[in-house]
A protein has these predicted regions:
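Phosphate-binding and adjacent anionic-ligand microenvironments
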Residues: 1-119, 126-130, 137-142, 149-152
Length: 152
């Protein structure tokens, strides 16, 4: 992604700090993986041209907001962040709290295994699904989530 370059100077600085402590970045990453798990990420981008395409994107977002499932592909939904309303709903504790980030047309669904986020592009006739999960058969699960949202 075009924004990924921003992390490079920070990673260089962090690697230098670790080296001063006698560690390598590889060691640190292995510790993180051991403690947190290995997450995989995938981006699905769908283009819908013209007025009908814009309406389809809006309908997908509206439907996803109003009919958020309690589980997806066997993964239990534990929380939902709707950046348009500025609210986070914790389904485990049945609590609603405010999101401190700016309002945006983004929905983020959390599972114990990670999250997915859905948002329309601000500059193109596209809608994007971000999948970040730590689970077996990641590619299959990610594709099934994509299909469930866009082929319904």
């Amino acid at each position: 992604d075009k924004d990924a370059i921003q992390i490079v100077p920070l990673m260089i600085k962090y690697a230098a700090e670790l080296k001063n402590k006698g560690r390598m970045l590889k060691d640190e990453l292995e510790d993180i993986t051991r403690n947190v798990g290995n997450f995989n990420d995938k981006l699905f981008s769908h283009t819908f041209e013209g007025t009908q395409g814009k309406a389809k994107i809006e309908n997908i977002m509206t439907q996803f907001r109003s009919e958020t499932p309690s589980e997806m592909c066997g993964l239990k939904v534990i929380a939902i962040e709707d950046f348009e309303t500025g609210k986070k709903t914790d389904l485990q504790n049945d609590e609603v709290s405010d999101i401190t980030l700016p309002k945006a047309n983004v929905i983020k669904i959390y599972f114990n295994e990670g999250f997915i986020a859905l948002r329309p592009s601000g500059t193109e006739p596209k809608i994007k699904l971000y999948v970040s999960l730590s689970c077996d058969h990641f590619d299959v699960v990610a594709q099934k989530m994509n299909d469930a949202i866009f082929n319904s």
